[in-house]
UniProtKB/Swiss-Prot annotation:
Family annotation (InterPro entries): RNaseH-like_sf, YqgF, YqgF/RNaseH-like_dom, YqgF/RNaseH-like_dom_sf
Upper taxonomic lineage: Bacteria, Pseudomonadati, Pseudomonadota, Gammaproteobacteria, Legionellales
Biological process (GO), any one: rRNA 5'-end processing
Family recorded in the similarity comment: Belongs to the YqgF nuclease family.
Name by which UniProt lists this protein: Putative pre-16S rRNA nuclease
UniProt keyword list: Cytoplasm, Hydrolase, Nuclease, Ribosome biogenesis
Main localization, broad class: cytoplasm
GO molecular function, one term: nuclease activity
Length: 141
């Protein structure tokens, strides 16, 4: 997908919350934009549709959680299922990114910015990191 101005929505999948970020390939930057509530991984698809339309997204990126040794876990399968549903429902190109350590990195960056209040939810910041990783991969192609 190189040499195109792509606008991507990135997702940090969780069973209770799904973080969302938006980014684009012109500046290779991303911003955290939303945390969507989910019930056992099920969410309001209309909210995602609204985000896709609002941001004019033309590609979707989903973080896939693996264990540190690269093995898969229950959440790995659930995130892949979510990714397949996204692609089927909206018909947009989809990329999956290894998201190991994104939540830890999101916390580190939160405190590095001098924000002392303990963050309750970092899902959208984790989505931003997932999307930044994907954007970097696009830049290197």
């Amino acid at each position: 997908m190189p040499n195109q101005n792509l606008i991507a929505l990135g997702f940090d999948f969780g069973m209770k919350r799904i973080g969302v970020a938006v980014g684009q390939t012109v500046t290779h930057s991303a911003n955290a934009i939303a945390i969507l509530k989910a019930q056992d991984g099920v969410l309001d698809w209309e909210k995602i549709k609204m985000l896709i339309e609002t941001w004019h997204a033309n590609v979707l990126v989903v973080g896939i959680p693996y264990n540190m040794d690269g093995s898969e876990q229950t959440l790995t399968f659930a995130a892949r299922k979510f990714a397949r549903k996204l692609q089927t429902r909206f018909g947009l190109p989809l990329s999956m990114v290894d998201e190991r350590l994104t939540t830890i990195e999101a916390k580190r960056q939160w405190y590095e910015q001098g924000l002392t209040k303990r963050p309750q939810h970092l899902d959208n910041y984790a989505a931003k990191l997932i999307l930044e990783q994907w954007l970097q991969e696009q830049k290197n192609e």
